[in-house]
Amino acid sequence: MNFVNLEQIENSLRNATFCMLFLTTFLYWFYTAFYSTNPQQIINPLSLTNIKTNFTYPDGFQANNINVSTTYLPINPVLNTEREEQPEANGTNGLLGVSSLVVNLKSIAIPRIMMGVSNLLLVLLLLVRWEKSGHFPLSNLYESLMFLAWCCTFLYLLYCTSFTLLVEKMLGSLIAPCSLLMNAFATFSLPKEMQQASPLVPALQSNWLMMHVTVMIISYATLIIGSLLSILFLILFKHKKGTPKKYDNFINNLDALSYRIIGLGFPFLTIGILSGAVWANEAWGSYWSWDPKETWALLTWLVFAIYLHTRLTKGWEGEKPAIIAAVGFLVVWFCYLGVNLIGEGLHSYGFFN
């Protein structure tokens, strides 16, 4: 393939990714808002068996010793505390059962498949970009935004089967628009020159490029997802006053899931900072220069280190560490994008121009 064909393919993939993410966002919002989830679908016993709560379900209904609660939604589903018998394979009950199963599968399968297609389109976009430029596509802000969007969708697809059905929909309703905004910002706001593939600048011609930048972007994506869950937890926690205690289990599971994901992203952030220090010593002769990007990366590390520490402190469960994670969400974005607005420092390849 020649360069012209690759240029056309890249433009087509970028437009297709934007459209697919837009449709995915709409579907996740639609299913989260209008699809009623029954109690049996809220707790996934295969993935949350290690989460313990002190809450006792009113009628004693349990699944693998995990209490099952209804969801906290503007539209409250009807609670059915009795186990439903499996419908017969023939007759009206059988047909209704099959119809219900088909609707249930479609409700989660369609947006999940569309998220997967979006992820695949982003992969193809990055591969075409790699072929055009001759290097791993992380040399400027445009490429890193596309890679960050891919990381967010990939992590969601990687963990979605571990989420409960409702958490999967709610998290998809957050990740899909975030990825859409990344794609839109990279496509419509950044200079056209940045969107064109170009050779690496001398400072980036190193094997550390893939190691350092890739790990940092993965850590950003993971911390963003975990922080979004903490923000969602805070919203539900604030409005749970006056609601039955049966909602507490679902809210607490959100908090526990946020902790698990942030706990995964923190080591990536640590490795990314350390690898960046080694690369800086090779390129600039110093492990640390207090560059704005370095300083804010350190602040990001400190915020989430405090978050993880408070999770181990008695009396700091729930709302307090979630507030720290919410602050971390803002710090991550400023470290990634906000610092670039300053236009100063050694990380000039990440600026907006």
Curated annotation (Swiss-Prot):
| Membrane-crossing segments per the record | 15-32, 209-233, 261-278, 296-313, 324-342
Mutagenesis / variant outcome for changing residue 301 to A: No effect on activity
Membrane-related topology note: Multi-pass membrane protein
Membrane-side (Stromal) residue stretches? 234-260, 314-323
What does changing residue 291 to A do? Abrogates production of c-type holocytochrome. No assembly of cytochrome c6 occurs
Give additional notes from the record.
Met-1 is the initiator; however when Met-1 is mutated a low amount of protein may be produced, probably from Met-20.
Q: What does this protein do?
A: Required during biogenesis of c-type cytochromes (cytochrome c6 and cytochrome f) at the step of heme attachment.
What protein name does the entry list?
Cytochrome c biogenesis protein CcsA
Origin species: Chlamydomonas reinhardtii
